[in-house]
């Protein structure tokens, strides 16, 4: 869509839309899978490397409901450690940009994890 609209490639960022799940609807902006939202979000994070089309990948998982579902935490602010874990795994799996509510903690976790990958 962006390329058809003549947006320069250097301004395109892929966002796999974690937490944005609708099973019904029409058009290209509706999820066309039969699984539940938790399975969908986990699958996307596990397979981020397969999304690479020479564009940066932005991930936004901080405080998302899938983390609350896994941890049994309904209050988003109680999901700090789950958010940091999901963000770090996302970067390991290919995310280039992280949008987070926890900038300092996420930066530290990713910095440590990256040392194990070298």
Kindly give the residue locations of the regions a language model identified.
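Active-site-adjacent loop and "lid" segments of alpha/beta metabolic enzymes
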Residues: 1-4, 8-10, 20-118
């Amino acid at each position: 869509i962006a390329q058809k609209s003549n947006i320069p490639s250097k301004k395109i960022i892929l966002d796999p839309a974690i937490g944005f799940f609708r099973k019904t609807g029409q058009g290209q902006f509706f999820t066309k899978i039969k699984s539940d939202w938790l399975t969908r979000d986990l699958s996307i994070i596990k397979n981020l490397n397969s999304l690479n089309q020479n564009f940066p990948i932005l991930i936004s998982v901080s405080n998302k409901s899938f983390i609350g579902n896994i941890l049994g935490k309904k209050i988003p602010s109680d999901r700090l450690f789950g958010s940091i874990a999901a963000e770090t795994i996302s970067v390991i799996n290919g995310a280039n940009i992280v949008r987070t509510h926890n900038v300092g903690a996420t930066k530290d976790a990713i910095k440590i994890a990256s040392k194990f990958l070298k």
